Each structure stands twice: as structure tokens, then as C-alpha cells.
Amino acid sequence: MAHRITDECTYCAACEPECPVSAISAGDSIYVIDENVCVDCIGYHDEPACVAVCPVDCIIKV
């Protein structure tokens, strides 16, 4: 499964550097997760790193 960033994203950029597979990039108004690249941090972290650092909890499981 992958994750998705919702429209509640504040464009703070906290998530982007945390992704171990570089699945997160800046979109026009919110950050975007490439669902074909996202591995839910399996093999890297105990929980998805982006979810752990998001200050507004706008990253959801797809």
C-alpha cells in the first residue's frame, strides 16, 4: 500500500527529505507522493516516516 498527501498540506516540506525512496516531491500547491514508488517505509522505518513528521496529519494510507 502507498500513502497520499491530502489538500490539507501546508507545503511545509517536512516530509520530502524523510522519504527513503524519494517518492515525495513538491507539487503546485501541495507535496505529492508517487504511489508507484512509495514502499510505506517497509524495511527502512517502523512506521512511514512522512506520517511521523507531518505537523498537520495530512498523509493518509491509500
UniProtKB/Swiss-Prot annotation:
Record-annotated membrane-spanning stretches: none
The protein's required cofactors: [4Fe-4S] cluster
Gene Ontology MF, one: 4 iron, 4 sulfur cluster binding
SUPFAM superfamilies: 4Fe-4S ferredoxins
Entry's cofactor comment: Binds 2 [4Fe-4S] clusters.
Entry annotated with the keyword Transmembrane: no
Residues where [4Fe-4S] cluster 1 binds: 9, 12, 15, 54
Domain of life of the native organism: Bacteria
Limits of the 4Fe-4S ferredoxin-type domain: 2-28, 29-62
Key words of the record: 4Fe-4S, Electron transport, Iron, Iron-sulfur, Metal-binding, Repeat, Transport
Record-linked Pfam families: Fer4
Binding site residues for [4Fe-4S] cluster 2: 19, 38, 41, 50
Main function: Ferredoxins are iron-sulfur proteins that transfer electrons in a wide variety of metabolic reactions.
Protein name, as recorded: Ferredoxin-2
Source organism of this protein record: Chlorobaculum tepidum (strain ATCC 49652 / DSM 12025 / NBRC 103806 / TLS) (Chlorobium tepidum)
